[in-house]
């Protein structure tokens, strides 16, 4: 079994997926097509119109032919840090200690990988391309905010880890 952790992304208010979430699911499917033993670990518990990010991703994967047995939903987390910790708990409870594939937007990869490594995981990065239709200023902001967020989130997960 190879866990493929797919980090969620905000949904539209009607519960439909935004482009970032669709890109992440496409990247996960592409990776999973090359690894038949994939277990898709879907994160994101912020509901919109009764749907969580994990629910929407599961629906997309099921529609693409992935079996329900190959899907594990983590639908209780409110942010990236919560997701990393919750996935760690889920996988450790199942006795898993091997490497994990990490699927998220390219700009978000550094933070997700850093947190999971701080939690003791060996990671394989599966970046989803980010939108190209954003303004230059918005793209700069999206990338620059990841640096302080990475430092902060790694400190949070290390604090959690050492309190265990």
Model-derived features: positions:
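A structural signal for short, hydrophobic/glycine-enriched beta-strand patches
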Residues: 1-140
């Amino acid at each position: 079994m190879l866990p493929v952790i797919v980090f969620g992304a905000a949904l539209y208010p009607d519960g439909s997926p935004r482009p970032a979430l669709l890109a992440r699911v496409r990247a996960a499917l592409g990776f999973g097509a090359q690894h038949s033993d994939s277990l898709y670990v879907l994160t994101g518990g912020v509901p919109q119109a009764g749907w969580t990010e994990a629910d929407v991703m599961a629906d997309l994967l099921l529609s693409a032919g992935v079996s329900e047995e190959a899907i594990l939903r983590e639908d209780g987390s409110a942010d990236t840090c919560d997701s990393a910790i919750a996935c760690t708990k889920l996988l450790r409870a199942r006795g898993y200690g091997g490497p994990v594939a990490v699927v998220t937007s390219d700009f978000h990869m550094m933070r997700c990988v850093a947190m999971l490594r701080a939690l003791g995981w060996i990671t394989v990065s599966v970046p989803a391309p980010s939108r190209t239709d954003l303004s230059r200023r918005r793209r700069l902001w999206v990338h620059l905010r990841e640096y302080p967020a990475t430092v902060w989130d790694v400190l949070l997960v290390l604090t959690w880890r050492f309190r265990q």
